[in-house]
């Protein structure tokens, strides 16, 4: 999800397979999904060293945990992945008495957890966000001054998408998210795998396929370098793109919009594998991370909203006061939660997605 940057030299990347020689926490998370000093400060405070293995994909995470013996003490699964892992018996049920900040979780996320009844007892929310439209304000307005930037019409109507093909359109490489957004746009069940629903979504997507330049989950570099002007993807893409452009001295402005037609919401979590060797270190890390000042630092660095209500006042106002990054209660209620669907439905959706991606 995030671009890999350098971490403190005292931190070791990659999973070590030898015997423990000291107090070591082994965690598995997306690249750059902490503040720059989070792990170093944890080690300085607790004396627990950290081995940070970078997650390639949710599918790899799931495969590692399903086979047991992963070697990790703490993992960071998405909402539906955590649900499947808990149903498979791959996660520990957490002891609330050992967690200091469960009551600090944002009320909206507390309600969102109700959609994941199996994993709620085994996870602590970490960060969250939505899927929406990140765009280069100048390039979009130059081509269409009255562009409906808060509408999926911008992407799903061929006559509009065609106007931005020359400056570059990308879609997140996620069948679950894109198909859910497309089906909801059509007024259909977002997580459906019915043939008639997938056919309707495929028809919608195929009409704009000629104008899609890339399928990728990390569009920041291409946005900043001018290879893209419109991207359907994570809400954090805008914050990261703007920060990167500002650091490079590029006079470009990016915006992010939650589509008025509705979109999906996702939540990443902290969880302890059932076979973790050092669950006590995992609890220590969760409690450290959930302190308001630490969660705010993580949010400010990653560009994603924090799960901690107490941390929100310390979040960068550019994020905190942006209603498309931190939607109000009414907008949040319209977001579509994930759903743990059967394998047969996942395969049907993947077939539709693959056909769309490979079409010319």
State where each predicted segment sits.
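Extracytoplasmic/periplasmic substrate-recognition and gating elements
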Residues: 221, 246-301, 359-360
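Conserved C-terminal helix/tail region of periplasmic/extracytoplasmic solute-binding proteins
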Residues: 329-360
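Bacterial N-terminal signal peptides
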Residues: 2-12
């Amino acid at each position: 999800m995030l671009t890999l940057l350098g971490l403190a030299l005292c931190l070791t990347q990659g999973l070590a397979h030898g015997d423990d020689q000291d107090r070591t926490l082994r965690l598995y998370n997306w690249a750059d999904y902490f503040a720059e000093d989070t792990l170093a400060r944890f080690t300085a405070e607790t004396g627990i060293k950290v081995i940070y293995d970078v997650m390639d994909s949710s599918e790899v995470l799931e495969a590692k945990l399903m086979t047991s013996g992963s070697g990790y003490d703490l993992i960071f699964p998405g909402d539906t992945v955590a649900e499947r892992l808990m149903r498979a018996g791959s996660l520990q049920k957490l002891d609330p008495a050992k967690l200091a900040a469960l009551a600090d979780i944002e009320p909206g996320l507390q309600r969102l957890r109700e959609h994941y009844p199996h994993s709620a007892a085994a996870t602590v929310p970490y960060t969250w966000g939505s899927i929406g439209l990140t765009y280069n304000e100048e390039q979009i307005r130059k081509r269409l001054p009255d562009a409906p930037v808060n509408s999926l019409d911008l992407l799903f109507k061929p006559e509009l998408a065609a106007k931005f093909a020359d400056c570059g359109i990308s879609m997140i490489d996620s069948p679950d998210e894109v198909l859910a957004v497309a089906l909801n746009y059509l007024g259909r069940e977002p997580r459906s795998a019915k043939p008639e629903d997938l056919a309707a979504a495929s028809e919608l997507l195929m009409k704009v396929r000629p104008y899609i330049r890339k399928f990728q989950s990390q569009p920041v570099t291409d946005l900043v370098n001018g290879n893209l002007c419109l991207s359907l993807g994570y809400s954090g893409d805008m914050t990261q793109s703007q920060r990167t452009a500002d650091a490079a001295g590029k006079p470009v402005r990016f915006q992010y919009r939650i589509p008025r037609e509705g979109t999906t919401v996702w939540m990443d979590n902290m969880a302890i594998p059932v076979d973790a060797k050092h669950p006590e270190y995992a609890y220590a890390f969760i409690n450290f991370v959930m302190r308001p000042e630490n969660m705010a630092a993580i949010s400010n660095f990653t560009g994603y909203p924090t799960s901690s209500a107490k941390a929100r006042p310390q979040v960068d106002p550019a994020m905190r006061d942006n209603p498309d990054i931190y939607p109000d209660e009414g907008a949040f209620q319209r977001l579509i939660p994930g759903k743990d669907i059967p394998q047969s439905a996942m395969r049907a959706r993947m077939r539709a997605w693959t056909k769309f991606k490979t079409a010319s």
